[in-house]
Protein backbone atom coordinates (compact mmCIF):
# COMPACT_ATOMS: atom_id res chain seq x y z
CA UNK A 1 0.00 0.00 0.00
CA UNK A 2 1.68 3.24 -1.12
CA UNK A 3 -0.18 5.24 1.55
CA UNK A 4 1.74 3.44 4.30
CA UNK A 5 5.41 3.85 5.17
CA UNK A 6 7.87 1.47 3.51
CA UNK A 7 7.27 -2.08 4.72
CA UNK A 8 7.72 -5.70 3.77
CA UNK A 9 5.42 -8.72 4.05
CA UNK A 10 6.84 -12.13 4.84
CA UNK A 11 4.75 -15.23 4.11
CA UNK A 12 5.04 -18.97 4.11
CA UNK A 13 2.37 -21.68 3.89
CA UNK A 14 1.15 -21.16 7.46
CA UNK A 15 2.45 -17.78 8.65
CA UNK A 16 2.54 -14.11 7.74
CA UNK A 17 4.30 -11.07 9.18
CA UNK A 18 4.67 -7.41 8.28
CA UNK A 19 7.70 -5.29 9.14
CA UNK A 20 8.04 -1.53 8.83
CA UNK A 21 11.35 -0.58 7.22
CA UNK A 22 11.55 2.98 8.55
CA UNK A 23 12.35 4.93 10.50
CA UNK A 24 13.75 1.65 11.81
CA UNK A 25 12.83 -2.01 11.34
CA UNK A 26 9.80 -2.82 13.47
CA UNK A 27 7.44 -5.79 13.57
CA UNK A 28 3.99 -4.46 12.71
CA UNK A 29 2.08 -7.76 12.66
CA UNK A 30 2.77 -11.44 13.16
CA UNK A 31 0.44 -14.34 12.53
CA UNK A 32 2.14 -17.66 13.08
CA UNK A 33 5.92 -17.16 13.10
CA UNK A 34 7.65 -18.22 16.32
CA UNK A 35 10.22 -16.02 18.04
CA UNK A 36 13.21 -17.84 16.52
CA UNK A 37 11.80 -17.41 13.01
CA UNK A 38 11.10 -13.73 13.68
CA UNK A 39 14.70 -13.17 14.81
CA UNK A 40 15.96 -14.83 11.62
CA UNK A 41 13.60 -12.76 9.47
CA UNK A 42 14.62 -9.56 11.29
CA UNK A 43 18.29 -10.34 10.66
CA UNK A 44 17.67 -10.89 6.94
CA UNK A 45 15.69 -7.65 6.69
CA UNK A 46 18.39 -5.79 8.60
CA UNK A 47 21.08 -7.08 6.22
CA UNK A 48 19.05 -6.05 3.18
CA UNK A 49 17.14 -3.01 4.46
CA UNK A 50 18.60 -0.57 1.93
CA UNK A 51 17.75 -2.83 -1.01
CA UNK A 52 14.22 -3.46 0.30
CA UNK A 53 13.60 0.28 0.75
CA UNK A 54 14.98 1.11 -2.70
CA UNK A 55 12.76 -1.55 -4.27
CA UNK A 56 9.71 -0.32 -2.33
CA UNK A 57 10.26 3.30 -3.44
CA UNK A 58 10.96 2.24 -7.03
CA UNK A 59 7.63 0.40 -7.09
CA UNK A 60 5.45 2.86 -5.16
CA UNK A 61 7.30 6.09 -5.94
Predicted feature descriptions by range:
Residues 32-61:
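C-terminal structural segments of small proteins and small subunits
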Residues 1-35:
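A short, structured beta-strand/loop element
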Amino acid sequence: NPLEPAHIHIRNAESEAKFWLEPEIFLARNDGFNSKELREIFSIIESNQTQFKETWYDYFG
